[in-house]
């Protein structure tokens, strides 16, 4: 047999975008491995390159187009998938094919079958699949000690600034048994922190009318509260964390807070509020826009004093008046959100918000974003300073000669702050990546904490 026949096809991979896109990439890589393909770490070593794109805002579109262009220049054989693959320009033409006509194939997001069909067409799979080489938890692109668990795909909402439903479709909830099986496999593989993600975590099960499923021989509804409770019980067996992201403030979220207070899951809630003024929320077509969010936040903190709340906001949305913006600032002063991201409104091609009157000038949008972040810096510093002197459990992400870089239950990877840990005084104590340790907080700034082991 010749070397050419023996060679294992190698696929290069570029993954862009949000954690949900990262999970799509992990699923593709897992299937590639199951079918006997190998992965390449460079363009030169790849027989073909897959680029998983993002297409939400203009900057993400440009980054994706640049990545495709680089892959074409360096390798020449490129398959494109992801959100940008489902996006059309103003004339209704495929953006990617128009800019890069030499790509081999283009698919939308969450399109494992289509991607693999394109791979098979241009790089036939090896004769002998290697399913036994694929770990039960699949191929992961995150460090071994944390992983994302996607519980659904798509979204039923039609927020005026967002085009995600046009790219990822309506809500499709995964069967609860499949979600729990993946979670168990991840914990068995050593994952210490599970980050639950979707476009709308609170809506889990709505599309299947909260159908009854089964896990470990017990009936469990396809519903957010029952899923969270089951994940919490499972995580306890492995001494692991469960963190919730993209939670809309629907009434049933109140039932999750006691679970956090009891330690079943992390007291951390990522709630994308986007604004506070009711008129702006109406223009945004936000779900749950009628909720009295200040009262909800106060009630949550009364039930769970250690609760950390993360949220995102948009400054300078079309029609936002000075009074509406000041209303937002007043809300933030009262709410004292722990972790906050603010974006100056950016028109997204295809979003209905583009047709709203009274667009806010770009310089005003940026100025308002800056004011929000300046206020948040004061709030964050105050809330972090209150933690000095306390002992808390942290998860180590990095270890170096200066000590370690860890995260507390209040810190999600990549988007929140970190805890810098000094080396232990006792020589026999060593910091290890992926392990929990208890530390005493000795200092704080507006973003991070410092601690001693």
UniProtKB/Swiss-Prot annotation:
Single GO MF descriptor: protein methylthiotransferase activity
CDD domains associated with the record: Radical_SAM
GO cellular component: cytosol
Binding site residues for [4Fe-4S] cluster 1: 18, 54, 83
UniProt GO BP: tRNA modification
Keyword 4Fe-4S attributed: yes
Domain MTTase N-terminal: 9-124
Domain of life per record: Bacteria
Record-linked Pfam families: Radical_SAM, TRAM_2, UPF0004
Cofactor(s), names only, from the UniProt record: [4Fe-4S] cluster
4Fe-4S recorded as keyword: yes
Keywords linked to the UniProt accession: 4Fe-4S, Cytoplasm, Iron, Iron-sulfur, Metal-binding, S-adenosyl-L-methionine, Transferase
Binding of [4Fe-4S] cluster 2, residues: 155, 159, 162
Locations listed in the record: Cytoplasm
Family named by the database record: Belongs to the methylthiotransferase family. RimO subfamily.
Name of this chain's protein: Ribosomal protein uS12 methylthiotransferase RimO
Organism from which the protein derives: Janthinobacterium sp. (strain Marseille)
Taxon lineage: Bacteria, Pseudomonadati, Pseudomonadota, Betaproteobacteria, Burkholderiales
């Amino acid at each position: 047999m010749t070397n050419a026949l023996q060679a294992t096809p190698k696929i290069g991979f570029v993954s862009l975008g949000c954690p949900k896109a990262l999970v799509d990439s992990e699923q593709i890589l897992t299937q590639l491995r199951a079918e006997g393909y190998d992965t390449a770490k460079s363009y030169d070593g790849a027989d073909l390159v897959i680029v998983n794109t993002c297409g939400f805002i203009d900057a993400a579109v440009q980054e994706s187009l640049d990545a495709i262009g680089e892959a074409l220049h360096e390798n020449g054989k490129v398959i494109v998938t992801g959100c940008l693959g489902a996006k059309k320009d103003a004339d209704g033409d495929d953006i990617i094919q128009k800019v890069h006509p030499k790509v081999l194939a283009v698919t939308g997001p969450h399109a494992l079958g289509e991607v693999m069909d394109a791979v098979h067409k241009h790089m036939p799979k090896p004769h002998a699949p290697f399913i036994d080489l694929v770990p039960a938890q699949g191929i992961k692109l995150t460090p071994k000690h944390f992983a994302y668990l996607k519980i659904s795909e798509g979204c039923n909402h039609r927020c005026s600034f967002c085009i995600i439903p046009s790219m990822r479709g309506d809500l499709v909830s995964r069967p609860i048994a499949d979600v729990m099986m993946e979670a168990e496999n991840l914990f068995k593989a050593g994952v210490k922190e599970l980050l639950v993600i979707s476009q709308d975590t609170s809506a889990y099960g709505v599309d299947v009318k909260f159908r009854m499923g089964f896990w470990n021989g017990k009936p469990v509804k396809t519903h957010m509260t029952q899923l969270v409770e089951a994940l919490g019980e499972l995580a306890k067996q492995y001494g692991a964390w469960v963190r919730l992201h993209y939670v809309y403030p629907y009434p049933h979220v109140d039932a999750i807070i006691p679970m956090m207070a009891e330690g079943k899951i992390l007291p951390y809630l990522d709630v994308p509020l986007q604004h506070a003024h009711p008129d702006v929320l109406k223009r945004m077509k936000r779900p749950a826009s009628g909720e009295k969010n200040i009262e909800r936040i106060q009630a949550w903190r009364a039930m769970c004093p250690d609760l950390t709340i993360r949220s995102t906001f948009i400054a300078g949305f079309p029609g936002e008046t000075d009074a509406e913006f000041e209303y937002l600032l007043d809300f933030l002063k009262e709410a004292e959100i722990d972790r906050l991201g603010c974006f100056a409104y950016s028109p997204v091609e295809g979003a209905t918000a583009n047709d709203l009157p009274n667009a806010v000038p770009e310089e005003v949008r940026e100025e308002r974003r800056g004011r929000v972040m300046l206020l948040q810096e004061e709030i964050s510093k105050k809330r972090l300073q209150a933690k000095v002197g306390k002992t808390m459990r942290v998860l180590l992400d990095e270890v170096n000669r200066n000590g370690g870089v860890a995260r507390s239950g209040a810190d999600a990877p990549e988007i929140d702050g970190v805890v810098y840990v000094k080396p232990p005084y006792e020589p026999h104590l060593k910091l290890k990546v992926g392990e929990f340790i208890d530390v005493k907080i000795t200092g704080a700034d507006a973003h991070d904490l410092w601690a001693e082991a």
